[in-house]
Amino acid sequence: EIRLSLVGSEMCIRDSSFEEIIQKGLRMIGQGMHGFVGNDSVEFEDLDHELAHPTDLRVFAIAQALEKGYTIDRIFELTKIDPWFLGKLKNIVDYKNKLSQYNKVEDIPADVLREAKVLGFSDFQIARFVLNPEGNMEKENLMVRARRKELGILPAVKRINTVASEHPELTNYLYMTYAVQGYDVNYYKNEKSVVVLGSGAYRIGSSVEFDWCSVNAIQTARKLGYKSIMINYNPETVSTDYDMCDRLYFDELSFERVLDVIDLEQPRGVIVSVGGQIPNNLAMKLYRQSVPVLGTSPVSIDRAENRNKFSAMLDQLGIDQPAWQELTSLEDVKGFVEKVGYPVLVRPSYVLSGAAMNVCYDCLLYTSPSPRD
């Protein structure tokens, strides 16, 4: 069986911490992972089999194995991955356990919180291990952020040297890291600056069309006399050519990182509407933090993306729509299908194109395990 799982690539910039870069890299894939640890619904029944067979999920099988007490030698025997890398991954699991000893964000000592950031833990991960909350965790995420800023634990901004450090180079090609301190560029409030959020890693149904939109946005901003600031991390895109904008942050498109950039740049506003699903998913979170979102209002984006709200709007306007229901169990699905018949379209809110979507022509498609299993 052959499955196409990836259509693009991503690139992370490493300073001195492998742990930081592997965690950032796993977040930047854009498949809903929060890092090496702290992910939802990643459990393997036959762990030895998963470790012995290279797949796109094996790195998470290694995380589970380390949490279950597998030794580095045993994992090496099954995976043949160099023990140096396995040792670094074990550092992440060990530090997760250390963070889990705290019950309040305020109880985390400054040195422990700083080391967590050096090891690539996001504010979201730290909140999950310390507070163990439910839901989308936006409030808890911001609690960690506030504590971190209170302690002066902020990411450094470094230039990427494109000539392999043969000589100093003053580029506008930037990334953020906790492995070192300080800024390689100067910051001041600029009312004539705009941040554009790119598309991140390409995936099936989300590709070069959003890069075209992003490039046009930054070019138009420059023509209008605005300083253009791009955040993106896909090396295949034109928008990550640092000649295209005034500043390029080659970094995560996460809520945490975008706020970090906004805190430093103090822009006139942020454009989320040209990068596809990842920026769209950030729109309401940024709006709730009083970040000026240019273009379509985040409230309108949410009204279009959220299927319940969109359906209610159609009803209010008297516009016909296909029969649909929000379902959480197979029994509910079967009951709905008995009413409307096949085929049925299955998809969540806040997705573009074919992501997380399926057309079912019989019950086997929605009751059987995925091809991965």
Q: Where are the predicted features?
A:
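Single conserved hydrophobic/aromatic residue that forms the stacking wall/gate
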Residues: 1-8, 13, 366-373
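Regular secondary-structure segments
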Residues: 63, 67, 90, 94-97
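Major-groove recognition helix of helix-turn-helix-like DNA-binding domains
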Residues: 86-91, 141-147
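Short alpha-helical segment immediately N-terminal to, or the first helix within
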Residues: 2, 64-65, 115-116
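Amphipathic, well-packed alpha-helical segments that form the structural scaffold of globular domains
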Residues: 26, 30, 90-94, 222
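N-terminal beta-alpha lobe that positions the nucleotide/phosphoryl donor
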Residues: 45-49, 56, 74, 95-133, ...
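Long hydrophobic segments that form regular secondary structure
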Residues: 9-10, 14-42, 53-85, 214
